[in-house]
Amino acid sequence: EKHDLILDLGCAEGRIPRLEAAEGIADGRTREIAILRCVGRPVCACVTEITPEGEILLSRRKAQQLAMDHLLQEAAPGDILPAVVTGCTAFGAFCDVGCGAAALLGTQELCISRLRHAGELLTPGQRIYAAIRTLDRVQRRVFLTQRELLGTWAENAARFCAGQTVIGVVRSLTDYGAFIELTPNLSGLAEDDGTLRVGDHVAVYIRAIVPETLKIKLSVLHRVEPQPREPLHYFQTGGHITQWRYGNEHFAKCYTIF
């Protein structure tokens, strides 16, 4: 049947019927593209039947349900887990948190930088770490956050020093200057001469780092060609986090309680 999945099980061949290929296919909540994305990739599935003819039938939907059941029963907000990005949108990234179970990582929870689209930071297929933000056991939904794992202002600022020249990305323009991202969780302010555009990659000179007010003063030197993304630098990749403060006791900026 159209969109059945044929699996190489090593010692045999198995088949996942279309309606068992993903949770939500039967009632229309999940689009057919979710099945097509499985082609050529490893998938988790449960054996549901071996027919008298020897055909092995499997269900990816059942594996997804079991994984989500386990997550909703055993996990808690603040738990850190690995995930794989499956799709990027303007409102966030969809992630596989195990056996195809889906969770949403909202754009505002990706990092401190102001992003217009999750694709500005993540790519489908990318392996990441995230913390559980909330669990909706009634609607069976999981929401993630990543910014708390990418370091505080002080942790990120410690990677730079005044007098250094680095590459940054223009993330926003205001009446008083341009905010330029040095890392996903760290930005500095530079004067805007009117030629900068959001998304520009620029070479900047770090004039000063001011921990007391969480400010980094920059000077734009020149535009550069778009740079390949550096791997995300995580300061925590496991265990549990109960609370997180981005700034200091005087300038919290962002504060999370799980």
What annotation goes with each model-predicted range?
Residues 1-6, 30-32, 37-56, 82, ...:
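OB-fold/S1-family RNA-binding modules
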Residues 6-10, 15-19, 57-61, 94-98, ...:
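Short, acidic/hydrophobic/Gly-rich beta-strand patch recurrent on exposed beta strands
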Residues 15-16, 44, 49-76, 80-111:
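Intrinsically disordered, low-complexity linker/loop segments enriched in Gly/Pro
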Residues 23, 65, 92, 112, ...:
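A broad, structure-centric signal for solvent-exposed, well-ordered loop/edge residues
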Residues 77-105, 113-114, 129, 134-136, ...:
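Surface-exposed interaction/gating patches
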